[in-house]
Amino acid sequence: MALPQGLLTFRDVAIEFSQEEWKCLDPAQRTLYRDVMLENYRNLVSLGISSKCTMKEFSSTAQGNTEVIHTGTLQRHERHHIGDFSFQEIEKDIHNFEFQWQEDERNGHEAPMTKIKKLMGSTEQYDHRHAGNKPIKYQLGSSFHSHLSELHIFQPKGKINNQVEKSINDASSVSTAQRISCRPKTHISNNYGDNFLNYSLLTQRQEVRMREKSFQCIESGKAFNYSSLLRKHQIIHLGEKQYKCDVCDKVFIRKRYLARHRRCHTGEKPYKCNECGKSFSQMSSLTYHHRLHTGEKPYKCEECDKAFRHNSALQRHRRIHTGEKPHKCNECGKTFSQKSYLACHRSIHTGKKPYECEECDKAFSFKSNLESHRITHTGEKPYKCNDCGKTFSHMSTLTCHRRLHTGEKPYKCEECDEAFRFKSSLERHRRIHNGEKLYKCNECGKTFSQELSLTCHCRLHSGEKPCKCGECDKAYSFK
């Protein structure tokens, strides 16, 4: 009994975009589209299709987009027992085709197909016989004609309605390995936006994930659906860096990384905030900046529910709970939870204070201290108390001042339960309990627990009497 014949076209495994829709795709989506189309063709070949097809590619020119016609014939030779086919030449040409597309993308061509490749393949026909079984052969002939729509980068304006042309009668007589899955085509119209494009690509991506990952990296064992993805991954192991900066000779493994890096030299800041007009060199920086206006803090600590604008800030905060201090001083072995703390600590060993005031040349170990110091030159006092109208140079000073109005004393001694408005007052008080006397008189060697006590004591040696009576002008050493 003759096996059934059916009509198979490349449309059964293609997604089609109009020229306008293609322009909406970003480079990552175009790369995904290319990989999917090549994988579909590879699948047709791997199922036993003898192909002789010319894949003419196209490019954008000043006269417009050049249309290309793909013609060929796909004949499928299948048997009851599928033989061992030799597709090395086809696979080689497919890889060359992929490589040429990637090269054109790197060179900045809008439509990256620029050359003509011929994919030639032939299947070696074998007669397979089991004991007592006669060979069963049949041909599933199909006409493979593509007028730009078969690799389907572009399609004329208007709706695209691609109906499934494949029909197989008596499917029960065909084995599972001999069937090609027939799925409905997607209907695309111009009024569909990016959501549709993403959805159609997502559908293809979900299919890819269901397939076996047959391209495996020997170094790491990681597997990929496509050989092109494997080659990109292998660059990591090989140390191959293809894109070099002309200014500083720094090299990058991705073209987009180089483009982003070049903005450091050019000063280009293409991303602008609509709220305040501030510009940024990277989109991610603008995204973070927007959160200053919106107040959004999407990163939340699971331990204390504190929220942060940036993931890096959350990671640093988590070390408070874990006690992790990954940054170690090579001089003294002291460890710190944040890299900035280590950098400031190193100034103790080097004596270097990297943050210098332009007005008075005074230097500081911390950038925040320099910012606070600069206000002394400008006289700016931007922080105002709502209760009494007094203004302050620093927010921390205003916070402490407010406690005079509220009576709040948040700092409590663990020994005697006495409370204080300021942390410095608590630190001085603790010396009463532990007997610590940090301040020593250079004249007599007497020590004191507080700096004020030492200052008053020194007047006994100097004879200084700064406290003067307003009535009789008599002076005293102590107030």
UniProtKB/Swiss-Prot annotation:
Stretches assigned to the KRAB domain: 8-81
Zinc finger region(s), C2H2-type: 215-237, 243-265, 271-293, 299-321, 327-349, 355-377, 383-405, 411-433, 439-461
Main localization of the protein described in the UniProt heading: nucleus
Compartment(s) where it occurs, according to its Swiss-Prot or TrEMBL record: Nucleus
Molecular-function annotations in GO: DNA binding; zinc ion binding
Keyword DNA-binding in record: yes
Keyword Transcription regulation in annotation: yes
Keywords: DNA-binding, Metal-binding, Nucleus, Repeat, Transcription, Transcription regulation, Zinc, Zinc-finger
GO annotation, cellular component aspect: nucleus
InterPro entries, sorted: KRAB, KRAB_dom_sf, Znf_C2H2_sf, Znf_C2H2_type
Matches recorded under SUPFAM superfamilies: beta-beta-alpha zinc fingers, KRAB domain (Kruppel-associated box)
Single biological process term from Gene Ontology: regulation of DNA-templated transcription
PANTHER family xrefs: FI01424P, ZINC FINGER AND SCAN DOMAIN-CONTAINING
Similarity comment text for this entry: Belongs to the krueppel C2H2-type zinc-finger protein family.
Functional summary from the UniProt entry: May be involved in transcriptional regulation.
Protein name, UniProt field: Zinc finger protein 525
